[in-house]
Structures are given as C-alpha cells and as structure tokens.
Amino acid sequence: NSKKVVIAAVNGFALGGCELAMACDIRIASAKAKFGQPEVTLGITPGYGGTQRLTRLVGMAKAKELIFTGQVIKADEAEKIGLVNRVVEPDILIEEVEKLAKIIAKNAQLAVRYSKEAIQLGAQTDINTGIDIESNLFGLCFSTKDQKEGIVSFR
C-alpha cells in the first residue's frame, strides 16, 4: 500500500520471502535466485498474501500448480511466467536495481504515484471503473508544476 514505488532485488532463495517480493511493484532477480511457495510441503497454506498475489501475477492455473506442488522455480522460469520483471547476473543486480530506481525517480513523482494508484485500484474493479479512476487521476496531474514543466520540455 506504499505510495512510493517499491523494487525488490532477489539474489538467492525467495521461499518464505516470495510473499515479500510479490508485494513489491517491480521484482528484479539475479540468475541464481529461486522462487517458490513450499508451504503445502510443511502442512500449511501460503500466508501473507501468497495465494492472492501469486494468482494476480502469474494467473490462476500457474499459481495453482506452484502452490499445490510446492515447486521451487529458477529465476528464468519466474521471468517467463511473469513473477519477476527481469533477470540479471548476480554481480550487477544491485547496480541494475539502482539504475531502474534512478530512472523512476527522475520522473514526476506525483504522476508516478497516481499511475501506481490507477494500476492498483483498477486491478480490483471492472475496466470501466478503472478507466474512470485513471481519468480522475490524469485530471489531477494538470494542476501540477511537474506537468507544466513536462509539457514545455517535451516540445
């Protein structure tokens, strides 16, 4: 629920920590990272949003397979199914995450915040309501200094 963009850098096992990574807006993994929801092998269900976030990120069929089997997957598979945004070599993971954070930080922060809000709220409703949310937030941007500067610099 943070208003700021949160980026996860995963460099190793994300099993119990998979829920934490899934709660982030963007997930960058090193090639040695592994992901899973192994709770069923321990006789419990995934907690802390694991069943809900995984389903939203990878789809119901893949989430069921991963949760019901307790399977651990490698970073490249996690990228393929949409669990992580990208995979990089372990020695440049932090550098790549910092680069991405700097790119995001250079943008108008209110617009980034409103974009995140539109995505989050829109995902919880039908498309028409989502478009209404987006439209309202879009309109709020027009009264900002950032928007006026952005339009001038775009020319």
Swiss-Prot record:
Pathway: Lipid metabolism; butanoate metabolism. The keyword Lyase applies. It catalyses: a short-chain (3S)-3-hydroxyacyl-CoA = a short-chain (2E)-enoyl-CoA + H2O. Pfam families: ECH_1. SUPFAM superfamilies: ClpP/crotonase. Keywords: Fatty acid metabolism, Lipid metabolism, Lyase. One of its GO terms (biological process) is butyrate metabolic process. One of its GO terms (molecular function) is lyase activity. Its EC number is 4.2.1.150. The keyword DNA-binding does not apply. PANTHER family: ENOYL-COA HYDRATASE, MITOCHONDRIAL, ENOYL-COA HYDRATASE-RELATED. Belongs to the enoyl-CoA hydratase/isomerase family. This is Short-chain-enoyl-CoA hydratase. The gene is crt.
